Amino acid sequence: DEIHFADGGVYRHAIGYGHFMETLLEAFPNEKDALSAYCSLLAKVGSLISPEVLRSGRFSAGGFDYMSMSAYDEIAKLTSDERLLNVLAGGLFQNAGHSRKTSLYEYAMVNHSNIEGAHSFVGDTQHVADAFVDVIKSNGGDVFTGSEVTALSVAGDRLETVTVNGKDEIIADNVISTIHPAATVSLLDNNSIIRKSYINRIKTLENSLGAFTAYLLLKPGVLRRSACNFYLYDTPSVWSAYDDSGNGEIHTMLMCHQNNGKSEYADVVALLIPMSYSHVSKWADTRTGRRGEEYEGFKAATAEKMLSFAGGFF
């Protein structure tokens, strides 16, 4: 990854802890101890999601301690260099992190995976979804598309049935929901398990930000594909770059060149900015392709702002 600041500063997050540290030492030669401690901390927390731990099917007990720690506070203990502190937060876009909100566990899991993993997929990510489906089916499972869970029926102290599309019922020993907690509890029928006070609290919690994405389709041979992702910031304070002002201003952006595996040139560039749901909530009850001229105008205007923002860095 490359972290770009409006003052011209460019810093790199390399793959592999050794390379990661060596690369940042070129920009911060006096921060060797801080970077060493940082890498050790990330690797320690990241070990909690090792394949061995995941195969056990249990959450590592040590992870709970890191969930109650502030990522910003713990990293700030390692260095007094403000620019380094913000460079280490360069990839916060992936979880819209913030100095007041992001836990060390959340931060470390994302950044450890980035350092130890690949920077992009060859082609699109559909083959990852296909691989998941293959694993599920090879273990006797089924995957249903075009299906919406419309009710979760409670009997006594357990969830008894899951209703799909308002008619089909599924009975299971365990049910896992990965949609918004407030949306999950709204599906409960005859709820006698979860207290009303908890449900009310879940519904009033501040939501995290989503991402607005603009895809640029390029003419062949125009732009050489870069082997990295670009994080662009017009503010020196990355840790607060994701405050939603509500005025539509852009302060940070993620830019990616899709690796099609066929050419050294990019055919698609993706531009992503963080966005609060409040900006699009007026179209909540509409369907794709039927949201009207106002929505199309909103998309076009936002895309133009994004192009202008990105153009200021290259």
Task: Describe the predicted segments one by one.
Residues P220-F314:
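C-terminal segments that line or cap access tunnels to active or ligand-binding sites in enzymes
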Residues T102-S113, P274-S276, W283-D285:
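Residues forming anionic-ligand binding surfaces in small-molecule and nucleic-acid pockets
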Residues G90, H112-S120, A211, A284-Y295:
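Glycine- and acidic
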Residues P51-S56, K137-V143, R224, G311-F314:
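Surface-exposed helix-capping loop/turn segments at secondary-structure junctions
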Residues Y107-N165, I170:
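Helical element adjacent to the flavin cofactor pocket in flavoenzyme catalytic cores
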Residues A6-T102:
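Rossmann-like flavin
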Residues T150-E264:
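Mid-domain catalytic core of redox enzymes
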